Amino acid sequence: MNFWDKIFLKGIKKFPYGSLQIEWPDGKFQKIDAIHKGPNAKLKIVDSNVVREIIQGGSIKFAELYISKRIITNNLTNLMHYCALNNDQAEETFKITIFRYLYNKYLHFKNKNTKIQAKKNISHHYDLGNQFYKYWLDKSMTYSSAIFNGKNDNLELAQNNKYQKLADLSSIKKGDNILEIGCGWGGFSEFLAKNYDCQITALTISREQFKFTTERMEKANLTSKVKVVFCDYRNIKGQFDKVLSIEMFEAVGREYWKTFFEKIKTILKPNGNVGLQLITIDDKIYNVYKNNPDFIQKYIFPGGMLPSVEVLKNIIENTSFRINSINSYSNDYAKTLNIWNKEFNRNWTKIEKLGFDERFKLLWNYYLSYCEGGFLSKNIDLKQINLKLN
């Protein structure tokens, strides 16, 4: 056992939750049990350089090693859950190097969400092709967490539940003039138009989503109610009774969080309100997270950033809003991600024919399991929030 292996084991033995069974490159097994119950994870280390690279490269390197098949596990979600539960101890064990610190600063700067860069960042993820997403999302083409009212709810019903809860939270009524910031593939706008007889302006900066949503409203005969606009939220004009947004705030970027709420304040009618669904990160890990881009920010959502609840509250209160209500749904997101992951893999043969390779498959498996583990551990949470002007 070399120097790096000893450091690695010393750190793992301090983890308080679950167990980790390691298969070393020489074929020997070693199991480390923590004091408290948790997921039972397995990790196969393929070559002798892996541990050194994990310690020197941190969580992003860990992801890259999985994608390159130099670490292997029989249950990726269990491993991600194990890592997330023991996040505090992992941060203490695998200290950040000055090179990683400077590189992280560069990544944040490079992906800063200016109006031009925001389009590039969104395109990086959402313009992989509508057919790609069709193969593993539900029929409503909803790419955000569902809410399961009962254990027998299928994904499509649970997505409808989510729409209904946010509409109720936002007091949507017939005749409202609504702005949806980040409309995705149009599921929520269609739901509102059909169920509330509203006028909706649906914003997107994804070319693929703009095309799909425009065609969707034409097919549903809803063009008189839903106006799909290719526009950055910072450029929108008008006055709205309600401003709604589902999991778009995560793409705004920390430098523009205040701008987001300041802009909404200028377009919201005096008695209007705001309904948001968004992901938050635990306050206790926010400070480390905000300075160190993770796997998601490097490979999946460049320019993205999650707020903590306290940070979010401070920004909201400093922009003349107040939180009227807030609800949490972390377990629902974990279940949604689990379903997506299964559907992604079940349909991989079709996805592969679109031109995606094995590395892409492993990247997306890691992404979906990484997020599921985060929600299971409660390091990240899903919130539905209603805001009103003071």
Q: Where are each of the predicted segments found?
A:
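A short acidic, Gly/Pro-enriched loop at the edge of an enzyme's catalytic core
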Residues: 234-243
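Conserved class I S-adenosyl-L-methionine
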Residues: 174-182
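Conserved beta-strand signature within the Rossmann-like core of class I S-adenosyl-L-methionine
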Residues: 271-279
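A short glycine-rich, Lys/Arg-flanked "PGG" loop and its adjoining helix->strand segment in the class I
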Residues: 258-270
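Conserved SAM-binding loop of SAM-dependent methyltransferases across substrates and taxa
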Residues: 185-196
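Feature captures hydrophobic
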Residues: 1-153, 157-159, 165
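Substrate-binding/catalytic lobe of Class I Rossmann-like enzymes that use SAM or dcSAM, i.e.
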Residues: 280-390
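Conserved SAM-binding loop
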Residues: 213-214
